[in-house]
Regions:
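A short amphipathic helical element positioned immediately N-terminal to and/or at the very start
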Residues: 1-10, 87
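The feature marks short, hydrophobic/small-residue-biased sequence motifs that occur predominantly
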Residues: 116-149
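Membrane-proximal extracellular/periplasmic loop immediately following the first transmembrane helix
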Residues: 34-126
Length: 251
């Protein structure tokens, strides 16, 4: 019986070879299509590091210079920031609004923009996604990040940041397990320009891992304070991040 089976298989070897080739091709194509879908589906189940439900984005706009009520004296950076903070206070007092913060950047969690840099600790390179925030404006509280290493979101918002200070995500400990606490540690950055000195950055606070997009597993997230905001940055792409109260619909 076995001899007969082998004889039949040999007689049909060409046809069987084509069937095997088709089976392999179908298997490869199925894997090629389903593997990315599986990865995307899995990534979407991972926590973002903040609560996206109840968050809205409202763009900041200015009157055109030809408008009757346009005031040229109000267009400088000082008056622009004063007016932005005035609008921010009004937003927070609006019924149904829990908190609000200005976003004068293209790079923040959930945005379509992105900014990246590579820092270093000792000899270890650390690629990171950079988000920018204005201190003392409720950025961390409005997003609702998860705190780490003791500081509250309010404390992270209201620290007196200096140039080259950073807030980082706790997943950095995965590659720096021996440092203990991240707060207080220093990273450095070497520019490609040989004429520039090494720049050092101080870690002032830590939040849990943040993913900028729900379809990505994400990378290390760093938050850099914006200490000098110009008026054109506010009007060209500035917006308000608004968090609604839990019982208020986004519709």
């Amino acid at each position: 019986m076995l001899k007969l089976i082998l004889k039949n298989l040999w007689a049909r070897r060409v046809r069987n070879a084509w069937l095997l080739a088709e089976l392999i091709l179908v298997t490869v194509l199925t894997w090629y299509i389903t593997d990315p879908l599986f990865v995307l589906s899995y990534n979407q189940t991972l926590p973002l590091g903040y609560e996206p439900d109840g968050l809205l984005i409202a763009p900041i706009r200015s009157l055109p210079s030809t408008a009757p009520d346009y005031n040229k004296e109000e267009a400088d950076s000082l008056h622009t920031m004063e007016n932005m903070h005035r609008m921010l206070r009004k937003l927070r007092d609006y019924p149904g609004v829990q908190n609000a913060a200005p976003l004068v950047t293209f790079a923040f969690p959930g945005s379509g923009g992105s900014s990246y840099n590579t820092y270093a600790y000792d000899t270890l390179a650390i690629p990171a996604s950079i988000s920018y925030f204005i201190p003392h404006t409720g950025f961390f509280e409005t997003f609702g990040f998860k705190t780490f290493e003791g500081k509250t979101l309010g404390e992270l918002d209201n620290m007196d940041y200096q140039r080259n200070d950073l807030v980082v995500s706790a997943d950095l400990l995965q590659i720096l397990p021996k440092v203990g606490r991240l707060t207080g540690k220093r990273l450095f950055y070497n520019s490609d320009d040989d004429e520039k000195d090494t720049t050092f950055f101080s870690i002032k606070g830590v939040v849990e891992k943040v993913r900028s997009r729900n379809y990505e597993q994400g990378m290390y997230s760093f938050f850099e304070p914006q200490l000098n905001v110009r008026s054109k940055e506010v009007w060209n792409g500035g917006s308000f991040l608004i968090r609604l109260q839990p019982d208020v619909s986004e519709q």
